[in-house]
Amino acid sequence: MKTKRVTIKDIAEQAGVSKATASLVLNGRGKELRVAQETRERVLSIARKHHYQPSIHARSLRNNRSHTIGLVVPEITNHGFAVFAHELEMLCREAGVQLLISCTDENPGQESVVVNNMIARQVDGMIVASCMHNDADYLKLSQQLPVVLFDRCPNESALPLVMTDSITPTAELISRIAPQHSDEFWFLGGQARLSPSRDRLTGFTQGLAQAGIALRPEWVINGNYHPSSGYEMFAALCARLGRPPKALFTAACGLLEGVLRYMSQHHLLDSDIHLTSFDDHYLYDSLSLRIDTVQQDNRQLAWHCYDLISQLIEGDTPETLQRYLPATLQFRHQ
């Protein structure tokens, strides 16, 4: 038999107080409105005894909010997005906010569907890593509810934004390694239309230039950010060269995953290749193959996204609407 949900009315009757008094106490306003301490303690004791939980629907009706935030990402299996989502969910949980997560599979049509689903669920705000070609839909949506873009900036959007500065650390990483590989340094990237792809290629090109090396067009190979694309691009490159490349930069952790899988399957993990990548993973410390990386601070990315969306939901104007965060370099080659 289904257990009856305990209501404020039930608690009020057991405590011998009015429903209004019980409601004030359970909503944390009893002391402020001079409800006697003994009465407050009696109401709270009965609520604890019955494991009372306030209705989120009633709370939403009172302040016209759903206390939910939507997060839209290309794929949750991506290590960077997974860590970001975990950090953001913890921040939301601590604030009593529910985080709703949807994936787009890098498909603009699917992105429109999941965004509309979020709107239908009346989220208070949305944080989006968009695969759209431009920000037109989000400019329109931002008139209806707060929107924060992260990781990607479609067509130099003026919307609130949180991103890692990809160019500066990538340039520094490559400039320090390139002098050892002046005759050959390959770049495997994702979709060229996405801002992270462009920024990381810009940093790669600048790093070569700082080392006095001109980028050769054939060194740049683009696909998408799925591990299978990294596998296929690296396989084609090895077939083209008849050997593994001497030096390689992958523009994301997923691409490097595909490269490592190919190398493992073809017994190339002990080959003489200098691997570098944007994005770090704790497992890289356990590999015999050393990998130098640009490491994003996903905790800071999540905090700044949460800070921006929270202020916008409250109707405040953040001091800085577009935030570019620094990254660190992880050198594993001696």
UniProtKB/Swiss-Prot annotation:
Keywords: DNA-binding, Plasmid, Repressor, Transcription, Transcription regulation. Residues 8-27 bind DNA. PROSITE patterns: HTH_LACI_1, HTH_LACI_2. GO terms for molecular function: DNA-binding transcription factor activity; transcription cis-regulatory region binding. Residues 6-63 form the HTH lacI-type domain. It comes from the Bacteria. SUPFAM superfamilies: lambda repressor-like DNA-binding domains, Periplasmic binding protein-like I. Repressor for the scr operon. Binds D-fructose as an inducer. PANTHER family: CATABOLITE REPRESSOR_ACTIVATOR (PTHR30146:SF45), LACI-RELATED TRANSCRIPTIONAL REPRESSOR (PTHR30146). This is Sucrose operon repressor.
